[in-house]
Amino acid sequence: RAALEALASVKQPADMALIQNVVRALYLPWLDASARHFQGLIDGAENAVRAKVTGSQHEKDSCLMFADGLRYDVAGMLAERLEAKGYRVRLSHRLAPLPTVTSTAKPFATLSHDKLEGGEDIVDFNPRFKNSPQAANAQRLRDDMASRGIDLLGEDIRPGKQGSTGGWLETGKLDELGHKLGARLAAQIDTELEILLDQVAGLIEAGWTRIRIVTDHGWL
């Protein structure tokens, strides 16, 4: 969080480059050591790790709100803002499928995760539907959720809550902005958090009394 605040505090290219170098010097050795340690822990224990990977939990009558690239510390910042507005909030984590890229982790964050599987022959790390050669792309996932009676919601159009099976909303541009802006994404965090807050408020106004916010991966 201190690194994000430092990067967000400067605007001039020279200042940004200086802060980036400092952050890199401090964090890169730790990140590298952490990644290698994690690899060592799972080496030879892939089946045990796979068994610990779970999809997003979902309660009846609740809306699952997928926020792309909502890194854990940024999720903590969102939780603080939600609490400040009087919402009851609980922050938790789960083990994501590997590799933690959108094509792998996002499908398991959906309400269709129980129908998905991996495999050595999958393409571009994209899981497929069980007993099917079909990759779990965005449209097939939405079609499957719709067949279960899930309300599929748009970012801007917020219809009133329809059924009691649950809802699904995709929102957030942290991942997209990160690819475009690089380290300058830090200056956009506040704006993106406010957008997520507005989405939560809109869902509540539409009749959703419980919202679970999930994501696919973080970023460096």
Q: Can you describe what each PLM-predicted range is?
A:
Residues 1-63, 69-220:
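…; additionally, a secondary subgroup of soluble metalloenzymes is captured
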